[in-house]
Amino acid sequence: MVKIAVCGAAGRMGGRIIAAVKEAEGVEICGALERPGHPMVGQDAGYNAGLGAIGVAISDDLNAVVQACDVLIDFTAPKVSLKNLEVCALYGKSIVIGSTGFTPEERALAAELAREIPVIIAPNMSVGVNVCFKVLADVAKILGEDFDVEIVESHHRLKKDSPSGTAVRMGEVVASALGRDYNKVANYHREGICGERTHDEIGMQTVRGGDIVGEHTVYFIGMGERIEITHRAHTRDMFSRGSVRAAKWVVTAKPGVYDMQDVLGLR
């Protein structure tokens, strides 16, 4: 039985992960974390998950929770995730990170810490999205240089980072397949008289509004034809189920940084 702890247990995603753990076989929820001073600290974690009491209180003691688990699932923010990763490395525990918005320096620090423990860092835990990553790489290689690439992503009005980590990953996948450096060809800004589109650039557009869970479309635009590859998320449950699947996988992995492509055997 894999013992799972959840960081951000009082949030929307944390609640869905706890519910997914309770539904899954071979795993159990052993800990729930929140920041010190959060009003739900001390309350049963099952209430936020819509389950009623499950006998696991939300705690603000990171060290104690990590020591008691086999793997920590973290959907918070980069700085919090890195702190959690440091503590997991200290105690030899695995971690699954779904936070987005990491800087290159933060990614480098995560890779350094992953020399001690297996770490999954994935901008999107959905099986469907990760299949899309595979499809995008294949399509980009087939189409080559004859099609322009544009990405449009849409999320709810409360999302803090832009563009989404999933959209950036899609851009990285396409750029790599085309032999380009994503950081050099990504275009996040078009306004006024900005000149014609360059051949290599990958455009990125963001929509924020309402309660959109997540939608990503990659356009391959040629002369006289267009291919659109779209993934739409209707609920957060696919992310929570994916994170539990990742947690079950990572506890048997060797130290290093992995993502959902590894979990799903898509490499």
UniProtKB/Swiss-Prot annotation:
GO terms for molecular function: 4-hydroxy-tetrahydrodipicolinate reductase; NAD binding; NADP binding; oxidoreductase activity, acting on CH or CH2 groups, NAD or NADP as acceptor. SUPFAM superfamilies: Glyceraldehyde-3-phosphate dehydrogenase-like, C-terminal domain, NAD(P)-binding Rossmann-fold domains. It is found in: Cytoplasm. It catalyses: (S)-2,3,4,5-tetrahydrodipicolinate + NAD(+) + H2O = (2S,4S)-4-hydroxy-2,3,4,5-tetrahydrodipicolinate + NADH + H(+); (S)-2,3,4,5-tetrahydrodipicolinate + NADP(+) + H2O = (2S,4S)-4-hydroxy-2,3,4,5-tetrahydrodipicolinate + NADPH + H(+). (S)-2,3,4,5-tetrahydrodipicolinate binds at H156, G165, T166. NADP(+) binds at R35. GO terms for biological process: diaminopimelate biosynthetic process; lysine biosynthetic process via diaminopimelate. Its EC number is 1.17.1.8. InterPro entries: DapB_C (IPR022663), DapB_N (IPR000846), DapB_N_CS (IPR022664), DHDPR_bac (IPR023940), NAD(P)-bd_dom_sf (IPR036291). Pathway: Amino-acid biosynthesis; L-lysine biosynthesis via DAP pathway; (S)-tetrahydrodipicolinate from L-aspartate: step 4/4. Keywords: Amino-acid biosynthesis, Cytoplasm, Diaminopimelate biosynthesis, Lysine biosynthesis, NAD, NADP, Oxidoreductase. The active site is at H155, K159. GO terms for cellular component: cytosol. NAD(+) binds at G8, A9, A10, G11, R12, M13, E34, G98, S99, T100, A122, P123, N124, M125. Belongs to the DapB family. Catalyzes the conversion of 4-hydroxy-tetrahydrodipicolinate (HTPA) to tetrahydrodipicolinate. This is 4-hydroxy-tetrahydrodipicolinate reductase. The lineage of its organism: Bacteria, Pseudomonadati, Thermodesulfobacteriota, Desulfuromonadia, Geobacterales.
